[in-house]
């Protein structure tokens, strides 16, 4: 799709990001995942922190913000311990969190993952066991299921890992 731009989020984007997160919460609820993002998650402070740390990005189509995601490099504390499996490797990685779409265009997950894969050789992501739509999208982008991690609040998430070196080796 043409006319797609990905750039870091700014404070000026906050109102639009909140709208997009609201749309995403409603979509998750309607598609069998009503408990992943509850009570207004993510809160304004978390969104602002992501922006201020340079981890929040927006996907723009024809000058309109249509999606957002967090791409953070470095060790994610919730990924230090994985149950019922193992990460593909111990290489440095980036983590994708809080990906959300306005629903205005298709393919935003693909655009975000291509962006992440261009910047990092190893990318990790997790999702709720009820989020079948996201699980399918993650697997379609070449991620491998690795096991279960626990969020800071103790909730379980299914953990996935993309490694460029492993994906390239499996194609040969």
Task: Show the residue positions of the predicted features.
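Conserved GNAT-fold acetyl-CoA-binding loop/helix
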Residues: 25-45
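Conserved beta-hairpin
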Residues: 53-69
């Amino acid at each position: 799709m043409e006319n797609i731009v990905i750039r870091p989020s700014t404070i000026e984007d906050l109102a639009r990001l909140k709208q997009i997160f609201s749309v995403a919460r409603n979509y998750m609820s309607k598609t069998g995942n009503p408990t992943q993002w509850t009570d207004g998650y993510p809160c304004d402070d978390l969104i602002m922190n992501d922006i201020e740390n340079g981890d929040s990005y927006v996907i723009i189509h024809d000058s309109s913000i249509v999606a957002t995601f967090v791409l953070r490099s470095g060790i994610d504390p919730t990924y230090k311990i994985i149950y019922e499996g193992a990460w593909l490797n111990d290489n440095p990685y980036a983590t994708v969190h809080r990906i959300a779409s306005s629903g205005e265009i298709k393919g935003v997950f693909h655009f975000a993952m291509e962006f992440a894969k261009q910047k990092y050789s190893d990318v990790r992501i997790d999702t709720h066991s009820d989020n079948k739509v996201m699980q399918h999208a993650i697997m379609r982008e070449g991620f491998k299921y690795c096991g279960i991690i626990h969020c800071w609040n103790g909730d379980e998430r299914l953990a996935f890992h993309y490694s460029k070196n492993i994906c390239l080796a499996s194609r040969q």
